[in-house]
Amino acid sequence: RPDTKIILTEPANSAILASGYINTRNEAHQPTESHPAFEPHPIQGWTPDFIPFVLQEAVDGSYYDELLPVAGPDGISWSRRLAAEEGIFTGISGGSTFAIAMKVAETAPKGSVLLVMLPDTGERYLSTPLFEGIDEEMTDEETAISQSTPSAQMVSG
């Protein structure tokens, strides 16, 4: 589609692309320093403390149309909502991607098509802030629901 737009996103508090600073690299294109704009953030798998060479090439070639920041708590919130409301079990990065998609959808022209990839699963984040405050054991009500479906029973304890 000729009207395709590519939107990049990065953690709002670790805006290394938005900073405009380019990592120095060795002959193998590996970064030789930590990016000065890097800050710790909860979006695991995103934004290490350097710009990967393949990403720098894409930035240099202007292979994207827009760069939008996303706050870590928004990613966590959307990841939880996707699980609870849609049955999509994704990690914080998937929730963060979806948060930006929802932001873009708010102003997209009527009839626009948005393709959003959530190449992640929530399973690997069970011990992270994503699941903070969620009990490990099923409630009596959840156990009853589980037992009402003989082919998919969960045993607690």
Language-model-detected regions and their locations in the chain:
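Short glycine/serine/threonine-rich phosphate/pyrophosphate-binding segments
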Residues: 16-17, 93-101, 125
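Helix N-cap / loop-to-helix initiation motif
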Residues: 89-93, 110
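Short beta-strand segments
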Residues: 8-10, 115-119
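Active-site/ligand-binding loops adjacent to catalytic centers
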Residues: 1-90, 129-157
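Residue-level recognition of the N-termini of beta-strands and the immediately preceding loop/turn
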Residues: 4-5, 112-114
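Short Gly/Pro-enriched loop/turn and capping motifs at secondary-structure junctions
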Residues: 73-75, 95, 122-123
